Amino acid sequence: MRSAAGSSAGRSCVVEAPHTRPHNHELKKEFPRHIPELAPSEAGSRKPAKCYDIPVPTFHVENFGCRATQADGAALERQFASQGLARAEKNDADFVILNTCTVTHSADQDARAAIRRLQRQNPHAKILVTGCYAQRAPEEIAALPGVTAVIGNSHKHNLAEIALREQNAPGDMVREGHDFSRAIEEQKSIAASAAEVNGSGSPQFVPLSILTPNPRNPEPGHRKPQAALYISNIFAHTELLAAPVFEGEATENSRTRPNLKVQDGCDNRCSFCIIPSVRGHSRSLPLPHVIREVNALVAAGYKELVISGINLGRWGRDLSETQNTHAGSRKANFVRLLESILERTQLEKLRISSVEPMDWTDEVIALVANSPRIARHAHVPLQSASDAVLRRMHRKYRPWHYREKIEKIHAAIPTAAIGADVMVGFPGETDAEFETTHRFIAELPFTYLHVFTYSARPGTPAAAMPNQVPVHVARERNKILRDLAAEKKHAFMQSFIGKTLDAITLGVAHDTSVAFSDNHSEPLAAASQCGESEREISLYTEALTDNYQKLYLPGTHPANRWLTLHIASIRDGAFVATPLATSEAKQ
C-alpha cells in the first residue's frame, strides 16, 4: 500500500495508556497493520507518542462535467476521508475514482481516454468508475482494461464501502446484494418507468444497456479479471450526495465561493436529454441539512455560496415537510429555500445557479431584486427560440413565455447578468428556425450564452428523429451565436465603465504579462493612481463581481474579501478596477 507522496499519510502516531492496544481511528480493519508491542512502563505513567510506519491507503477523485458532478465528487472525498483514507495525487493513489459525465458523446470519449491514460501512469491503482456514464453504459466501461469496478449513480452513496470491499474481494459478478438475474430485471424496469412517465407503451426514454457478463474472450489460460458492476434502477434511488465544492486554487487560504448542490435528478423528459435516466427522479436536500451546511461554511469564513442542482427550481417539491414562517406554515418550494437561507444564516452573498424559466416566478424575481444578499445574476436555459423546435424538444414553455421572464428579470434587476443555454443543430432544425433563435437572442438583454452543439444520446427520442443536422452546419450555427454572445457581453461590460461594482476576491495573482495580451498602459495607469509600487503594479488579483463578471484588481489582495470597486477599463474580457477610498465605499 502506497502512501500519499510528500505527506505523513504513511505514518500513524498513537499515544497509549499502560497495557492497552494501539488505537487508530483512521485505519480500517481491511488493511492489516503490524505494530510492535511496547515495553511496559512505570505504573500510572503514560507512554510517549510513538510513530509507526503503517501503510494508510490513499485515494484520488477526478471529476468530469457539470457542477452537480463536482458536488458528487466532493461528497465522495468526504466518504473516503471518513473511512480513514488519505488523499494523494492521481499517479500515486491506491484508489482512483473517475466520476464521469455522459451528457455528450465527447464526454464519454474523455472518460475512456482518462481510464486508458491512468492505467499507463498508475498501473497498480484500483480504478473505480462512477457517475452518469457508469450508470448509462456500465458494461461498456467494464470492458476497458484496468477497470476494477463500475459503480453507477444508484450505488454512489456507498462507493467508499465498495472500494474497501473490492480491495480484498475482487471478482466476476454484479455485487448488488442480489442475484444477477434480478439485476437484469431492475435494469429493464428503467425503460418501463420511462415509458410510464411518457404515457406510451414503448420505452421512449432510458433504454440503457442490459447488464450482461462481459465476454472478454481471453485466450485460454489467460483469463483477465472481470470488473465488478454495481448498478440498479436509478428511479428507485432516493439518496442525495451533498458536499460543498470550492472554486479557486486548492489551498486552505485561497478557496472561495463554495458550491452546494441542494437538488438532484429531474422529472422533465426533454427529448434530447439523458440526465433523468442516469440521475433519477427529482429529490431535494432537506432544509435543515441545507441550513447546517450553509452555517458551517459561514462559520469557516466563506462570504459567498452558490446553490445548484440538476433542476434547482424544483427544490422542495418532493419534500413532505412544511416550513414555518412569519406567514404561517407553507409548503417547501424554491422561494421558501431562498428566504430560509437569508433568514436563518449570516451568509453575505447567495448566488443562484441555473434555474428553468418556469421557476423564475414573480415571487423569486422580487426576492432577488429586493435582497442585496442575493447576487445580481440569472441563468435561464433557453435551448431554442423556435416554437416548433421547443415542441420537438419537449420543453415546457413557449418562446413568448421565455421572453416575458427575461424582460421581467431585466426590469426588476437592471444590472443583473443574464445568461442562457442554447442548443444548435437539434434534429430537423432548419435555417429559418435557427434564424428565429438568432434574432430572438439579439433582441433580449443577454449578457452571455453557453452554446452547445446537439449530441445524440443513446436511447433518447431525439437520437431517433429524422433530419439530423450535418455537423458542419451545426458548428457554423454555433459560431454565429458565440460571436453574437461576445458582442452582447462587451456591450454589457461597457455600460459599467466609470461606475462602481462589488466584487469578491479570488486570491489568484497574475503578472500583467500573463493576464493581458495587449497594451498594459490603462491598467498600469490605474494602479499608479492608487500609489502602488513598481513591483506591486505588475501583479493583479482576480475577482468576480456581484453580477458575474471577471475582474482584475491591481496589487495582491487576500482571497474571500468583498470590495467596492471603481471600474476603469476592460482587458481581455475582464474588468480592470481600482478600490474606492474607505470614505467613498461607505457612502
Indicate where each model-derived feature is located.
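Short polybasic linear motifs
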Residues: 26, 32, 46-49, 216-218, ...
